[in-house]
Regions:
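Acidic, Mg2+-coordinating phosphoryl-transfer loop and its flanking beta/alpha structural elements
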Residues: 121-161
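Glycine-rich phosphate-binding loop signature in dinucleotide/nucleotide-binding domains
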Residues: 6-8, 61-63, 113-119
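Conserved phosphate-coupling serine/threonine residues in phosphotransfer and NTP-handling enzymes
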Residues: 20, 69-71
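A short, structured active-site edge motif that brings together acidic residues
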Residues: 86-100
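Surface-exposed amphipathic alpha-helices with a cationic face
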Residues: 53-61, 110, 130-134
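Conserved Lys-Pro-Asp/Glu-containing loop-to-beta segment of HAD-superfamily phosphomonoesterases
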Residues: 12, 103-130
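Short, acidic loop-to-helix structural element flanking the phosphoryl-transfer center
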Residues: 40-67, 77, 81, 103
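Active-site neighborhood of HAD-like aspartate-dependent phosphohydrolases
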Residues: 1-48
């Protein structure tokens, strides 16, 4: 996909956490069974995709950044801390009554970050991320390296399709 620099169009960049920033696939079975103490002890099995840790740090110098996740806040906060991710805000499962694909989690993040929908973009790896973005009135970018195939993500018609985390540099820096 051809990338056009969007640096002046957005003030805030929001991300999904699991399988967009962090490959947490090794924790899925434990998370489904709600074995949280075991999950926290297995963070060493997770990894940040590509150079996303460095990219997030660079993005945070020019944009407000945040994570919008369907994961519990305690888990998300600990995972963010474990990987030392440079973000401004977190909107997690317990922060809203309704969850993606409902727009409430993204709208909550926009409120916390003191922005407006037309000043934000949301980056996620699932169709529900793209649907939630559209419902919240924000631009969307599908991360093709996550849990759903590029065909699945593309079926939701994201505004942008990212092949690798490095595409974020092309778009925003």
């Amino acid at each position: 996909m051809r990338m056009t620099r969007l640096s002046s169009e957005f003030k805030s960049i929001l991300f999904d956490l699991d399988m967009t920033i962090v490959d947490s696939s090794s924790l899925l079975s434990l998370r489904k069974r709600r074995k949280w103490n075991l999950v926290y002890n297995q963070f060493h099995q997770t990894r940040v995709y590509g150079e996303l840790k460095v990219i997030l740090k660079r993005l945070s110098q020019s944009y407000r950044t945040g994570i919008v996740t369907s994961s519990p806040k305690k888990y998300a906060s600990r995972l963010i801390t474990y990987h030392d991710l440079d973000i401004d805000i977190l909107s997690a499962y317990h922060d809203t009554r309704r969850h993606k694909p409902d727009p409430d989690p993204i709208l909550n993040a926009i409120s916390i970050i003191e922005s407006k929908p037309d000043e934000c973009i949301y980056i996620g790896d699932e169709v529900n991320d793209i649907i939630a973005s559209k419902r919240a009135g924000v631009k969307s970018a599908g991360a093709s390296w996550g849990s759903e195939s590029i065909i699945q993500i593309n079926s939701a018609n994201p505004d942008f399709l990212l092949d690798t985390p490095d595409d974020l540099i092309k778009l925003f820096l």
